[in-house]
Amino acid sequence: MKAAGYSDTYMSVVIKAFTTEDKISRFDGWDSINKAGVKTATTLGTTFETLSKNWFPNSDLTLIEAPARGDQEVLAGRSDVFITSNVEGSTLLSKYPNIREIPAAPRNPTPLAMLMPQADQVWINFVDHWVKIKKARGFFDELAKKHGL
């Protein structure tokens, strides 16, 4: 059995916290979320469920069954906060003008890489070289800025 290969990493996905415009003044970082009376929402069975349980043991956690999602609970006013990746968060910020990012340092950086055939070292080397050149020229930084990452 062969395992997959990966390219060098080119950027990272991080976790951020979000709320609505009317509640943003209540939150100034991660610690302000981890309090009794704060309702956090997340989708049952996801990585975000585990992270929410670990990071916010003092908050009131609502687990939402898919296909519903934590952001929908917050937008509906039934919860105060949800967490998601910077990638999805950027999309939600542009889609819903009422959503606000809570000012807090991003958490849990996860490097992104391209899935590659492990046995094709020539191809892996080519892609790694391409990633290195693109990084040096600021390509991935420009993409991140363009898409609000």
Pin down the residues of each PLM region.
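A ligand-binding cleft/hinge motif common to bilobed small-molecule-binding domains
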Residues: 1-3, 51-54, 75-108
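Acidic, polar ligand-binding/catalytic clefts
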Residues: 1-32, 98-107
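A bilobed periplasmic-binding-protein/Venus flytrap-type ligand-binding module shared by bacterial periplasmic
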Residues: 16-25, 110-130
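Beta->alpha turn/N-cap motifs
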Residues: 20, 45-46, 66-67, 83-90
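Short helix-initiation/N-cap motifs at beta->coil->alpha
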Residues: 25-28, 62-76, 108-110
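Short loop->beta-strand "edge-of-pocket" segments that line small-molecule binding or catalytic clefts
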Residues: 30-46
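Hydrophobic residues within well-ordered alpha-helices
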Residues: 33, 73-75, 114, 127
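Ligand-binding clefts/hinges and TM-proximal coupling segments of bilobed small-molecule sensing domains
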Residues: 37, 46-62, 101-102, 131-149
